[in-house]
């Protein structure tokens, strides 16, 4: 019997929406009989932009903008066809990027 392993990587700007999506995936996998490892929180990616507030005067006055990308990793082992079918039917909120790899 071939054991399938599914790796799901989730990314979002809002960590609350991301955690809700992870919980929804975990509940679905547990109901369909899959073995789950995770969620594993990956390092948060932080991007910062520095912008001048004034076009010509007061050059030392700057404003900083920041964007954070939160990530989670879920491994599903012993995935059955029912598990894969259930994962395909999940509707996740907008703003959550999902990457699925089968091995």
UniProtKB/Swiss-Prot annotation:
Instruction: Tell me a GO cellular component.
Output: ribonucleoprotein complex
By its UniProt entry, which InterPro entries does this protein fall under? Ribosomal_uS10, Ribosomal_uS10_CS, Ribosomal_uS10_dom, Ribosomal_uS10_dom_sf
Q: Any idea which GO molecular function terms this record carries?
A: structural constituent of ribosome; tRNA binding
Specify the superkingdom: Bacteria
Statement: the UniProt record of this protein carries the keyword Ribonucleoprotein = yes
Q: In the UniProt record, does the keyword Ribonucleoprotein occur? A: yes
One of this protein's GO BP terms? translation
SUPFAM superfamilies xrefs: Ribosomal protein S10
For this UniProt record, give its keywords in alphabetical order, as a comma-separated list: Ribonucleoprotein, Ribosomal protein
Subunit structure, as described in the record: Part of the 30S ribosomal subunit.
Q: What does this protein do?
A: Involved in the binding of tRNA to the ribosomes.
The UniProt entry's sequence similarity note says: Belongs to the universal ribosomal protein uS10 family.
What's the protein called, per UniProt? Small ribosomal subunit protein uS10
- Give the source species: Persephonella marina (strain DSM 14350 / EX-H1)
């Amino acid at each position: 019997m071939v054991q399938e392993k599914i790796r799901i990587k989730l990314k979002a700007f809002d960590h609350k929406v991301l955690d809700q999506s992870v919980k929804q995936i975990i509940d679905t996998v547990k109901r369909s009989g899959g073995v789950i490892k995770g969620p594993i929180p990956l390092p948060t990616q932080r991007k910062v932009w520095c912008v001048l507030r004034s076009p010509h005067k007061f050059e030392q006055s700057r404003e900083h903008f920041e964007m954070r990308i939160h990530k989670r990793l879920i491994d599903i082992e012993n995935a059955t066809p029912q598990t894969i079918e259930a994962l395909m039917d999940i509707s996740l909120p907008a703003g959550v990027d999902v990457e699925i790899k089968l091995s």
